[in-house]
Regions:
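Extended, charged alpha-beta segments that form solvent-exposed binding/catalytic grooves
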Residues: 22-272, 277-285, 290-302, 311-318, ...
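Aromatic (phenylalanine/tyrosine) cluster motif
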Residues: 10, 18-22
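Acidic, Ala/Val/Gly-enriched low-complexity intrinsically disordered segments
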Residues: 6-8, 13
Length: 446
């Protein structure tokens, strides 16, 4: 439906029928999702109720940690992404030239938008700035398990604090978000690493800084790529896979990592983390501690990931603002699949508080007034939009899992009209004045 406008613009004279028809059933684009309300017709469909459940948990835990919610536009200048990642990222984006001749893209990630926003107005906010968002992100890439061409994501970031205590705070937030869904230390682990340690390793063996990004990309894919292919790529850069494997296995924590581990241990969260230099994060802008969350059974790709990006604000602001920063992203696709497999998604009940029966159409105006009164009292109430037989109305009330039915009773001679309230679970019935109905519906049956 269009939100307004003249139907004649679309060749629909006088609001009539469309002068054309589609030759086939329209479907969504590959890699995109439709979200349906429960109950779902098919088990492989995406649940709007599950999505809202996840959003609710994300928001609740982030707010407990003192994070404030923000948002930004889904379209950004293409340069915002090529500035930090180079032109090669364009192949992964949904980008186009708009009618004003601007090169723009659907956002593939939220961090550059946030860095732009903070750089523009950071002087108005006391540090550290702790913000979160739940954006929808888009990437034109090959679909695979746990990865589509769009997803929603919890982004949580801290600006203006360079101390590792901020890194520990962010990791603790991620742990508690995962725990809020019923996941335990038996289900997931946060793997901590350090880009500083890897940078030292690289600099000691290669004088060509221009090869660093390619090196990090290879390390980031070691677990997913054939060892022979990784060995060859590393050799081309002057590195030896066996030496790198030994460095990873040694796993000696840096000073910053030890500080984070001690901080988390003081919170009772040490069992959820381990140092693992296999994690390096492929994005070019990471500068310090990096981390990823994995399910311990190894059934899924990384659940979440993030780290420090102390130079990004300076880069995006053209050198005008320099703020240390760190953050993580936590997508909904892998999380939903993980919760399904672990049996941790709740049953989403679409039950309503009451269904208003209208068995006498002369009572419809009074019934509508009752419905409105109950809804304004915060109750979920439905009623038949058009005249229907009483048995059909009652069946509809049961289908909607109504806790009660309500209906006006004929007023006795000289008496006050009453509302008949029936509890469909206990089968108890009572007749009440209209003003007493809302409190009665809100009171649990004993």
């Amino acid at each position: 439906m269009w939100g307004g406008g003249d139907p004649a613009r679309f060749g629909i004279a006088g609001g009539g029928r469309f002068p054309f028809s589609f030759p086939h059933m329209m479907d969504r684009l590959p890699g995109f999702r439709d979200f349906y309300p429960e109950p779902l017709p098919l088990p492989d469909m995406w649940s709007a109720d599950a999505r809202q459940y996840i959003f609710g948990k994300w928001r609740a835990v982030a707010r407990r940690y003192g994070f404030r919610e923000y948002d930004g536009p889904p379209l950004e200048p293409l340069e915002l992404y090529t500035l930090k990642s180079g032109d090669e990222i364009v192949g992964q984006l949904y980008n186009f030239t708009d009618k004003g001749g601007r090169e723009i893209a659907l956002r593939p990630e939220m961090t550059p938008t946030l860095a732009r926003m903070v750089a523009a107005h950071e002087r108005h906010y006391k540090k550290p700035v702790k913000w979160f968002a739940i954006p929808q992100l888009f990437r034109y890439e090959r679909q695979q398990k746990g990865r589509l061409r769009e997803h929603f994501q919890l982004n949580a970031d801290i600006f203006g604090e360079a101390d590792p205590a901020a890194d520990a705070e962010l990791v603790a937030l991620l742990i508690d978000v995962l725990r809020s869904f019923g996941l335990t230390a038996d289900d997931f682990v946060i793997r901590l690493s350090s880009r500083n340690a890897w940078q030292d390793y690289f600099n000691q063996r290669c004088p060509d800084a221009g090869k660093a990004y390619a090196f990090y990309q290879i390390i980031d894919k070691l677990e997913r790529e054939d060892p022979a292919a990784s060995r060859e790529k590393l050799a081309q850069l002057g590195f030896n896979l066996d030496e790198i494997t030994a460095f990873i296995q040694a796993g000696e924590p840096t000073v910053e990592l030890r500080g984070i581990l001690d901080n988390l241990a003081a919170r009772g969260l040490r069992d959820y983390v381990k140092v693992d230099y296999q994690v390096i994060r492929g994005l070019a802008y990471y500068t310090g501690v990096v981390f990823e969350a994995f399910d311990k059974k190894g059934e899924f790709r990384a659940i979440a990931g993030g780290g420090r990006y102390d130079n990004l604000v300076k880069l995006i602001s053209g050198g005008k603002v320099n703020l240390p920063a760190l953050g993580f992203g936590f997508g909904d696709v892998v999380l939903l699949e993980l919760l399904k497999v672990r049996g941790l998604l709740p049953t989403f009940d679409a039950a309503i508080d009451a269904y208003c029966l209208i068995e006498d159409e002369s009572l419809r105006p009074a019934s509508l007034q009752l419905v409105q009164h109950l809804r304004e009292a915060g109750l979920a109430v439905e009623y038949p939009l058009v005249a229907a037989k009483p048995d059909k109305q009652f069946k509809r009330a049961q289908e909607m899992k109504a806790a009660h039915t309500v209906k006006w009773e004929p007023a006795p001679a000289g008496g006050e009209p009453l509302v008949r309230v029936r509890n469909l679970r206990t089968k108890q019935e009572q007749s009440l004045p209209a003003a007493a109905v809302a409190p009665a519906l809100a009171t649990p049956a004993t």
